[in-house]
């Protein structure tokens, strides 16, 4: 069954087992009761498509797509509709019902577009925080890579308050001092942690990163560049209307990083809907100006 499904829609291991077959076929509408725990703000399909179209206009033609917390997979579906040379897709998601729904949506996409070229699609039911990317990194060495998505908009301390298991391993990620450094309890946004891990993964690759993040997270990443010197050639921020797109009262944007060797320390801010440049902020003569 899995071999047939892969020929039909590109998904490797469509069914994990017999139980998975029945749960996918008879999957009900998904209503999550733990959205707060997972910082779960799902990207609507129109926004995901608009983001992919923006990237395509900039000449981005990925051969490999990675979505670190893919949720319902709207970015994966949008990428399949937008880019014509995708060879492999990796989607990682902790909430299995979302993956089951995504599998059916991808199947429907290829049933509706039978002439479309098939990508090899790996949908992995895993927690990002204990997922090892190294075994798959060799498969995309030297290829054009796009990391895309909308990682959770929640802090680790908030997850700790509600006793969540969806936490990264304790580490001095934010270079905290004193007791916080010892206990690993320094507060930070989960999305920032995910973004930094993806930047490290993409170092030395031909790659772009496009993530929806809170503006405070983007500012932290730009501010950290003076010390980290990640190999980023260009940093761009496209402001979105989070209230309109997500019903969320928070300042948020699309962060677009072009990987390279320059160690960019300034961010160009644009309006997402018009692509009109607004201003630039970052490091100037050793001072962070925002």
At which residue positions do the language-model features occur?
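S-adenosyl-L-methionine
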Residues: 1-58, 108-135
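Signature of N6-adenine DNA methyltransferases within the class I
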Residues: 36-37, 41-50, 69-77, 86-89, ...
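Alpha-solenoid repeat scaffolds
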Residues: 58-61, 86, 113
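Conserved class I S-adenosyl-L-methionine
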Residues: 62-69
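Gly/Ala-rich phosphate-binding loop of Rossmann-like dinucleotide-binding domains
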Residues: 80
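Conserved phosphotransfer cores of two-component systems
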Residues: 83
């Amino acid at each position: 069954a899995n071999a047939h499904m892969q020929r039909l829609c590109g998904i490797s291991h469509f069914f994990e087992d017999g139980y998975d077959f029945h749960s996918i076929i008879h999957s009900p509408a998904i209503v999550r009761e733990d959205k707060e725990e997972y910082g779960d703000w799902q990207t609507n399909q129109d926004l995901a498509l608009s983001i992919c179209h923006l990237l395509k206009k900039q000449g981005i033609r990925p051969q490999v797509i990675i979505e670190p917390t893919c949720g319902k997979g709207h970015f994966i579906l949008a990428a399949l509709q937008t880019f014509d040379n995708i060879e492999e897709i990796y989607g990682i998601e902790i909430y299995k019902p979302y993956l089951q729904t995504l599998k059916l949506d991808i199947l429907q996409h290829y049933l509706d577009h039978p002439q479309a070229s098939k990508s090899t699609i790996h949908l992995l039911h895993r927690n990002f925080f204990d997922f090892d990317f190294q075994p798959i990194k060799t498969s995309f060495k030297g290829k054009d890579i796009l990391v895309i998505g909308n990682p959770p908009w929640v802090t680790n301390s908030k997850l700790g308050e509600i006793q969540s298991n969806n936490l990264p391993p304790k580490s001095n990620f934010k270079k905290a001092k004193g007791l916080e450094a010892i206990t690993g309890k320094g507060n930070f946004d989960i999305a920032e942690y995910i973004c930094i891990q993806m930047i490290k993964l993409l170092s030395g690759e031909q790659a772009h990163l496009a993530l929806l993040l809170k503006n405070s997270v983007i500012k932290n990443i730009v501010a950290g560049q003076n010390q980290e010197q990640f190999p980023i050639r260009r940093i761009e921020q496209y402001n979105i209307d989070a209230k309109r797109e997500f019903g969320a009262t928070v300042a948020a944007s699309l962060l677009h990083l072009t990987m390279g060797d320059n160690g960019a320390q300034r961010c160009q801010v644009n309006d997402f809907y018009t692509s009109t440049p607004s201003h630039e902020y970052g490091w100037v003569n050793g001072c962070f100006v925002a």
